Amino acid sequence: MAKEKEHINVAFIGHVDHGKSTLIGRLLYETGEIPEHIIEKMRKEAQEKGKATFEFAWVMDRLKEERERGVTIDVAHRKFQTDKYYITIVDCPGHRDFIKNMITGASQADAAVLVMDVVEKVQPQTREHIFLARTLGINQIIVAINKMDRVNYDQKEYEAAKEAVSKLLKMVGYKVDEIPFIPVSAYYGDNVAKKSDKTPWYNGPTLLEAFDLLKPPEKLVDKPLRIPIQDVYSISGVGTVPVGRVESGVLRVGDKVVFEPAGVSGEVKSIEMHHEPIQEAYPGDNIGFNVRGVSKKDIRRGDVAGHPDNPPTVVKDFTAQLVVLQHPTAITVGYTPVVHAHTAQIACRFVELQKKIDPRTGQVKEENPQFLKTGDAAIVKLEPTRPMVIERVKDIPPMGRFAIRDMGMTIGAGMVLDLTPRK
C-alpha cells in the first residue's frame, strides 16, 4: 500500500469580504471536493437558464444565495488533497466575534493562507489576524492577493499590495523572503489550481503548488497522549463513549487511559473515526472511543485523556506569554476572566504581572508592570479557580495555547511557558 499522505491543517485568515469563502470554494471545486450531486444540480440549472458555460463563479453565486437563505452546504471540516498532503481547512471567518474561533481554531493550524483584496489591501482584521497567527505559533504563511480581476491583473497593483502586507508581516517577525505572494482571482480561478495566462509577469507557484511547499507539522506522534474531550455519550449496548481530537501521542485499542482532572481511568474497548472502527488513532484524528470502567457522569467536556504513565498535567498555576488584543480599561492583578484552552473553559485569576515585553523582539520593556492594556504583550502568572489541565507549549504545543474571554469578547491570546503541577 502506498504511504498515506501527511495531514496538514490550514487556517484561512484575512479581513471580511476579501474573498476567503470564494477562495475555499474554488479550491474545493478545483480539487473535486464539492459533492457531485450539487454540481450536477447546478449544471442542470445552468442549462435551463441558458448558461451554457458552466462556470465555477456561477456555482459560488449559487452557494452564496443558499447561504443567505440560511442553507449552509456542510463543509465545516473541509478537506482536499494536493500531490503531497491531505489538507483540512480551518476556516476563520472575518468578523470580530470570530476571533475566538480563530484562537481556538488557529491554534490547531499548521499554516495559514492570508487572503487579501488587492484593492483594499491591509484592513484592521488583516492586521489582527497576522498578529494572532504569529502569537499562536503559526510559522508558515501563504499570501493570496485576491481579486486581481478587479485591477485587470496589473503587476503594479500586485506589487503595491505585496509591499503593504510585507511591512506588516516583517513587523511581527515573519521571514518575508520565505513567503509566497500569489496573485489570484478566486472568482475566475487565476493561479489557484492552474497558472494564469493573465499574469505572465508572475512566475511563482499557484496556490495549490504553494501548499506542497509547506513543511509538514512537527511530529506529535512521539509526544505523550493527549485527547481533550469535546463530548461524552452513553450508548446503550456499548457504554461510555468520549469524543475528541487526538492532539498528541497514539491511542490504541486495549490501552489503559486516565482522564484528568476527573481522576478516573478505564480501558479502551474500541475506537471509531467517521463511523468506521479503527485499531489506533493518531494526532489530528477526530474520534469516539469506548472506555470500560468509566461512567458518563465521571467525565465531561474539558477533561483530557492520557496514558497513566504520563498523565495530563493538572496545574496549580501557570506562567504564560500573553498578548492583550482588546480590553476596555486595563488588566491588573486579581482580574479573573475565562481561559479557553483546548476544550476547557475555566476562570483563571491573574496572580502576577511579571514583565511587559516587546512582542516583536521579546525584549523586556518593563518589570512588574502595574497594569496591562490593549496591545501589550506580557509574561503573567495565572491561577485556575478549579482544577485544569494545560501543558507547556514547548512540551506539547497544541495543549499549551489558550484564549482569554470576558464580556463577550476575546481579551487576549497566550501560550504556557511554565507551570506548577497540582500536588
UniProtKB/Swiss-Prot annotation:
Region (G3): 91-94
Region (G5): 185-187
GO MF term list: GTP binding; GTPase activity; translation elongation factor activity
Tagged with keyword Iron: no
PROSITE patterns: G_TR_1 (PS00301), G_TR_2 (PS51722)
Cellular component terms per the entry's GO annotation: cytoplasm
EC id: 3.6.5.3
Secretion signal, residue range per the UniProt entry: none
Domain tr-type G per the UniProt entry, residue ranges: 5-221
SUPFAM superfamilies: EF-Tu/eEF-1alpha/eIF2-gamma C-terminal domain, P-loop containing nucleoside triphosphate hydrolases, Translation proteins
Keywords: Cytoplasm, Elongation factor, GTP-binding, Hydrolase, Magnesium, Metal-binding, Nucleotide-binding, Protein biosynthesis
Chemical reaction(s) catalysed: GTP + H2O = GDP + phosphate + H(+)
Region entry G4, spans: 146-149
Region (G2): 70-74
Enzyme class: hydrolase
Subcellular localization(s) per the UniProt record: Cytoplasm
Residues binding GTP: 14-21, 91-95, 146-149
Residues reported in the UniProt entry to bind Mg(2+): 21
Residue span of region G1: 14-21
Name of one Pfam family that matches: GTP_EFTU_D2
Family assignment from sequence similarity: Belongs to the TRAFAC class translation factor GTPase superfamily. Classic translation factor GTPase family. EF-Tu/EF-1A subfamily.
Role this protein plays: GTP hydrolase that promotes the GTP-dependent binding of aminoacyl-tRNA to the A-site of ribosomes during protein biosynthesis.
Full protein name: Elongation factor 1-alpha
Organism name: Archaeoglobus fulgidus (strain ATCC 49558 / DSM 4304 / JCM 9628 / NBRC 100126 / VC-16)
